[in-house]
């Protein structure tokens, strides 16, 4: 199965490639991830639907029109949902500090907003929604989440986005400190991918 990734985020492309390789089995067809960069780049998409599934659907549709008929597309929309912010920034996580904001700018803004929130109220979870468009245009949706808490300052140099300030439940290190191997076993994206991979083996 070849999935064309509807994302211009190089970090996501690398993460999906690792997840696909890790989920490969001898008794099932391999899943190949083709990055948008390999297809001339990802078209610009305004993520304005207000929902994870709506944004993923827009991204998938934008890339699909550039591909040969019958191509399969994978779109991802994800974010960090903070208890003290009633689930925010959520679907707006990628541009929390502005439309061109970096991952660092986004998490620094979040830390400022939460500056007066005590440790016991800094619960949060990462959420990932994966949407597959098959060759006939049918949609398949997979979801994953990872519960945890937010730090008061960034820790670690690996990962991207909000990784340096998020500590998953059961650990005392941030996503950015845990390293790729651990993160790709427990993350929100890994959990959504596990569902997708299992579906792919059954299809």
Curated annotation (Swiss-Prot):
How many and how are cofactors bound here? Answer: Binds 1 Mg(2+) ion per subunit.
Cofactor(s) it depends on: Mg(2+)
**EC assignment:** 3.6.1.66
Top-rank lineage group of the source organism: Bacteria
- What does the record give as the reaction this protein catalyses? XTP + H2O = XMP + diphosphate + H(+); dITP + H2O = dIMP + diphosphate + H(+); ITP + H2O = IMP + diphosphate + H(+)
What are the catalytic residues? 77
User: What residues does Mg(2+) bind to?
Assistant: 47, 77
Metal-binding keyword on record: yes
**Gene Ontology molecular function terms on file:** dITP diphosphatase activity; ITP diphosphatase activity; metal ion binding; nucleotide binding; ribonucleoside triphosphate phosphatase activity; XTP diphosphatase activity
Keyword Cytoplasm among UniProt keywords: no
Report one GO cellular component. cytosol
- Supply the InterPro entries for this chain: dITP/XTP_pyrophosphatase, ITPase-like_fam, RdgB/HAM1
Q: Which residues form a coiled coil?
A: none
Q: What is the protein's quaternary organization?
A: Homodimer.
Protein role: Pyrophosphatase that catalyzes the hydrolysis of nucleoside triphosphates to their monophosphate derivatives, with a high preference for the non-canonical purine nucleotides XTP (xanthosine triphosphate), dITP (deoxyinosine triphosphate) and ITP. Seems to function as a house-cleaning enzyme that removes non-canonical purine nucleotides from the nucleotide pool, thus preventing their incorporation into DNA/RNA and avoiding chromosomal lesions.
Protein name per the record = dITP/XTP pyrophosphatase
Top-down, what is the taxonomic lineage of the species of origin? Bacteria, Pseudomonadati, Verrucomicrobiota, Opitutia, Opitutales
